[in-house]
Amino acid sequence: MTHEEQRIWLIKELQKDRSQLSHYRIPNDEQGQKDLLRGLMNIWMPKPISEEYLRIESEYLRAENEAKGITKISDLTPVEKDLYLWQGDITTLSCDAVVNAANAQLLGCFRVLHSCIDNCLHSAAGLSLRYRCFEIMSEQGHEEPTGQAKITPGYNLPSQYVLHTVGPIVSGRLTEEHCELLKSCYLSFLKLAEENGCESIAFCCISTGVFGFPQHKAAEIAVSTVKEYKKQQAAISR
């Protein structure tokens, strides 16, 4: 199959899961097709996936991700020793692990074409990521608590792992509890990363979007927590 044929095949396979969308016309333009495929992935309910689908999806998504351009840690300039500040698409970073700011269900974002990091990572990684999260949550039997972390493979992402953490929601005045919970997010995924042999981690701004955590304070907590952890644990180098 050509890249376009793979995209159309994937769309048709996912349309089979939604009877009301099975006769939805596939757009003729490339961007329209990409948006439809991503939208179908966004609303996909987790269930076992065929090997054929996974193979074609993997070939397609890896080509898409490579076309965006992969950024390696070695391409970046540290602001301090082994500490980097980078603005860009985290789905294009090649490192041991990237951090996902997840919600308590831990299944990814179901809002079609939403721009949150949860949606972007799941869309670039493929359906296997949602299914693995579903297995983890089914075994756990309850929502993911704030301040903890889970780890999954990165699947079709350039990074080996995804670390999922649920940040605190600030709906009113910022409290000390909010700050401690955010710090716990960083400590939890740093510890989990170390346990899985990760040396380089890329993390987004946790809780600073719709969760309402003040950005400046969140950045202070992130940097200070990482620095403190690195002093005690040398395994996480970057």
Placement of each model-derived feature along the sequence:
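Macrodomain-like recognition of ADP-ribose-binding/processing modules
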Residues: 1-238
